[in-house]
From Swiss-Prot:
Glycosyltransferase that catalyze the transfer of GlcNAc from UDP-GlcNAc to the GlcNAcbeta1-2Manalpha1-3 arm of the core structure of N-linked glycans through a beta1-4 linkage and participates in the production of tri- and tetra-antennary N-linked sugar chains. Involved in glucose transport by mediating SLC2A2/GLUT2 glycosylation, thereby controlling cell-surface expression of SLC2A2 in pancreatic beta cells. The gene is MGAT4A. GO terms for cellular component: endoplasmic reticulum; endoplasmic reticulum-Golgi intermediate compartment; extracellular region; Golgi membrane; Golgi stack; peroxisome. This is Alpha-1,3-mannosyl-glycoprotein 4-beta-N-acetylglucosaminyltransferase A. Its EC number is 2.4.1.145. Its main location: Golgi. Pathway: Protein modification; protein glycosylation. N-glycosylated. GO terms for biological process: glyoxylate metabolic process; N-glycan processing; protein N-linked glycosylation. Residues 1-4 are cytoplasmic.
Amino acid sequence: MRLRNGTVATALAFITSFLTLSWYTTWQNGKEKLIAYQREFLALKERLRIAEHRISQRSSELNTIVQQFKRVGAETNGSKDALNKFSDNTLKLLKELTSKKSLQVPSIYYHLPHLLKNEGSLRPAVQIGNGRTGVSIVMGIPTVKREVKSYLIETLHSLIDNLYPEEKLDCVIVVFIGETDTDYVHGVVANLEKEFSKEISSGLVEVISPPESYYPDLTNLKETFGDSKERVRWRTKQNLDYCFLMMYAQEKGIYYIQLEDDIIVKQNYFNTIKNFALQLSSEEWMILEFSQLGFIGKMFQAPDLTLIVEFIFMFYKEKPIDWLLDHILWVKVCNPEKDAKHCDRQKANLRIRFRPSLFQHVGLHSSLSGKIQKLTDKDYMKPLLLKIHVNPPAEVSTSLKVYQGHTLEKTYMGEDFFWAITPIAGDYILFKFDKPVNVESYLFHSGNQEHPGDILLNTTVEVLPFKSEGLEISKETKDKRLEDGYFRIGKFENGVAEGMVDPSLNPISAFRLSVIQNSAVWAILNEIHIKKATK
């Protein structure tokens, strides 16, 4: 009898374990599918946004055509000889369109009038590849003649060899040869076709070069910022090269990332870039930076390229590209009545840096004649000691003593981890928002892989509602109210504080981390995520 009972118990235990394992496997598979669906949804959302932008663009182009017909009508004064090629329906439509009085919008030709002399000025003189479109990421690589050594082949091998087969179908690499010497251009094309014939035929790699008529006269440029005449010419032409490449790439994908012809990349770079962008799909960013050097690894959303190109065309002779990009951000978000720190905080929400860097500069000999540049990205080989999130613009402060420049400001902006000497009771870390924010959740993570023991202990999380009176809150929430108006909503456990914010407390003016007991260890804060509530 005992044996029989034991057998039954064993059988029941086996069945229970089997069912539990089956349930867990089903749940895990379901979770993975959900994550995949979420990524597909975010990608679809981006494509829809780009489609809306392109419809608006086509509307603008149609308006330009109408303006041209108006000029034709005015010049011919309704001459039958000029219009007899059109059908009656077309003539009727033209009459309706041109009869409406409207203002004329300045175009690219206002800043580059020389383009009107040749109708092919904005058409690539050389175009190799099958014209792939509909990809996630377009990589743009401008290249010009170098006196000493070309790094282009090595750069392309690094980019291509670090792509998985499925990733090669979801991107396109556009090589822009910024030269008008046809013999040189054809020589570069021949080398690329020989080295990357498979990649070109598959659509992964495309090669273009501009017509000579695209460039204006660059011989009489004004020397500025102490640059020599040759350097001013070099940087001015470089701005024009970037613009041509961006215009060509704009309609090919969701994102455009600017690269150079003398770099190497990290493994898994494509997936890292794509996932980082999708994580930020609900944020209003303009530039994602995957390298700290110059214009390397700067990624934009395709619709934003229109604004960027227009801005560069307006000032292409005045300043280098990286300065112009910073001016765009300043114009968009900086308040002249506020100080520089406020401006930097606002720009940090549009210009988001990913660490560690995914691209390393390896070129020693610059494309500028005679220039040697020993530039390397110091973040390229660094381990990731902090996790980056986009947080609401805020003024940050702390009573803690900072260690070796690891400031709270840098942590909040995703540039470094915060490191402070032993906290004591009464110390605080304060995040005061520039304007009240509806917050959904929060996450504060202390310690890192190099110093896992430097964590926040006996520390609480507190929020200050924008409205001090008239809050419709539960008794449980009301009991958490402190004398200074803050509400205690959480605390650190094993170095981590994480939780949801009671919606009745929104909008929030500030977050505060308060140390309630002396600590025996130093403190590192390597992750800050104050997640805004979705509308």
